[in-house]
């Protein structure tokens, strides 16, 4: 009887251990990115980067889980690498139509035009079939703000950059989906305490330490293969000309690659304008803040969980006498 009890207890302990192991799921990807910027009568630059992203998800209970992302990077052209670092670590709770997030979490604005990165803070979302409402608040460091370019094609130096200090980030967004083919989103992004008063992309200084960007975006699906997306946003703070304080994007997309579907593909064409003070960290790999122009690209699934991307940009700096710029960008992602 005693031996039987010990076996029973051992079985319970093993079962508990298995349950805990099952509570943590690991996923991620390895991605390789290569790109080249080519300025007319200006400096060219290239990127040749390998990146590993690990994404564990731990279930806490019926309502809560914890997500994290751990990144490591290597630069293939110089044979150097960076230290592995924590990019995301946030708790996520689900209660009916409500989702609550807190920690170092990913935040994306409509279509990723203004922001697609992480920050330290919290987010509350309400979503049903027709409406999604979202409120975000937190702190955003200067490292989140993507580099801008001067009119000669040179990156702004540290003392010339628009955002000189960690700021307070707030966002509110409301999405309405009247049908399965159409959705429209209105949003407002407010960032304060940036020490950006002296930023001068041309001759006039910005004159404010705050960014206040309102934006409207919409998506329309003509059928299962063709989608048209549009966005317009404007920063109402500061004293710069409107070309620096506004952004807009129009994109036509055909199909799309799925990592689970070998042979699937997608194509797109777009025109975008990303004013220096109207965006923070856009989602795009080709066009960059302070540029405007045309972009075309495509994606293809070579095998299950292996997807390749390529894009080409042709445009110019937004500043007067802005230098013409072209950029080729490519990426391959191995999901696991």
Question: Where in this protein do the model-derived segments appear?
Answer:
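N-terminal periplasmic/intermembrane-space "pro-region" immediately following the signal or transit peptide
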Residues: 1-29
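Functionally constrained cores in energy, signaling, and assembly domains
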Residues: 10, 48, 330
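Outer membrane beta-barrel
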Residues: 25, 29-36, 43-149, 166-187, ...
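Outer-membrane beta-barrel pore domains
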Residues: 33-45, 78-81, 94, 162-164, ...
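Short, low-complexity, polar/charged sequence segments that are solvent-exposed and flexible
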Residues: 119-123, 152-155, 203-204, 286-290
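Intrinsically disordered, low-complexity Ser/Thr- and acidic-rich flexible linkers and loops
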Residues: 148-161
């Amino acid at each position: 009887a005693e031996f039987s009890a010990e076996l029973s207890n051992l079985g319970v302990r093993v079962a508990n251990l298995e349950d805990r192991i099952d509570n943590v799921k690991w996923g991620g990807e390895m991605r390789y990115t290569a790109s080249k910027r080519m300025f007319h009568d200006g400096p060219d630059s290239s990127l040749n980067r390998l990146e590993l992203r690990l994404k564990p998800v731990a279930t806490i209970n019926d309502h809560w889980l914890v997500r994290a992302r751990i990144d490591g990077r290597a630069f293939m052209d110089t044979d150097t690498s960076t230290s592995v670092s924590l990019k995301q670590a946030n708790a996520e709770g689900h209660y009916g139509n409500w989702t609550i997030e807190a920690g170092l979490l990913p935040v994306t604005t409509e279509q990723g035009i203004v922001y697609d990165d992480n920050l330290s803070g919290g987010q509350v979302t309400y979503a049903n079939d027709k409406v999604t409402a979202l409120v975000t608040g937190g702190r955003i460091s200067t490292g989140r703000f993507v580099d801008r370019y001067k009119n000669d094609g040179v990156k702004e130096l540290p003392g010339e950059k628009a955002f000189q200090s960690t700021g307070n980030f707030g966002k509110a967004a409301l999405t309405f989906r009247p049908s399965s083919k159409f959705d429209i989103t209105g949003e407002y992004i407010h960032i304060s305490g940036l020490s950006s008063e002296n930023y001068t992309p041309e001759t006039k200084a910005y004159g404010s330490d705050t960014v206040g960007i309102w934006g409207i975006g919409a998506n329309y699906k003509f059928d299962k293969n063709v989608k048209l997306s549009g966005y317009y946003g404007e920063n109402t703070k500061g004293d710069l000309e409107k070309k620096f304080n506004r952004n807009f994007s129009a994109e036509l997309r055909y199909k799309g690659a799925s990592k689970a579907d070998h042979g699937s593909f997608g194509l797109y064409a777009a025109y975008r304008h990303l004013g220096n003070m109207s965006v923070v960290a856009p989602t795009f790999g080709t066009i960059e803040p302070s540029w405007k122009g045309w972009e075309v690209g495509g994606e293809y699934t070579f095998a299950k969980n292996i997807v390749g991307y390529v894009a080409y940009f042709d445009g110019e700096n937004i500043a007067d006498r802005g230098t013409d710029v072209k950029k080729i960008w490519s990426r391959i992602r191995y999901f696991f």
